[in-house]
């Protein structure tokens, strides 16, 4: 492998701006902000949505079902 061509992989704290939830993960993304997390100082990356606020993970997801042509026909003529 060539030296000095790979990005620096390091631990960073991701913060969900919607809920304030923070978690530690590895990343190559750089940030000028830092935060104290579990007694250590890490770079801070702000994200708009995470598993703490995404409807799929929180159980607040709504499923919509598009009616097909047959369903629309049956509704139109009062069948079924």
Curated annotation (Swiss-Prot):
Gene Ontology biological process terms from the UniProt entry: translation
Keywords: Ribonucleoprotein, Ribosomal protein
Classification via InterPro entries: Ribosomal_bL28/bL31-like_sf, Ribosomal_bL31, Ribosomal_bL31_B, Ribosomal_bL31_sf
PROSITE patterns, sorted: RIBOSOMAL_L31
Pfam families per the UniProt record, alphabetical: Ribosomal_L31
UniProt GO molecular function: structural constituent of ribosome
UniProt keyword rRNA-binding present: no
Cellular component, GO, one term: ribonucleoprotein complex
SUPFAM superfamilies: L28p-like
Keyword Ribonucleoprotein (UniProt): yes
The protein's assembly and partners: Part of the 50S ribosomal subunit.
Family assignment from sequence similarity: Belongs to the bacterial ribosomal protein bL31 family. Type B subfamily.
HAMAP family according to UniProt: Ribosomal_bL31_2 (MF_00502)
Protein name as annotated: Large ribosomal subunit protein bL31B
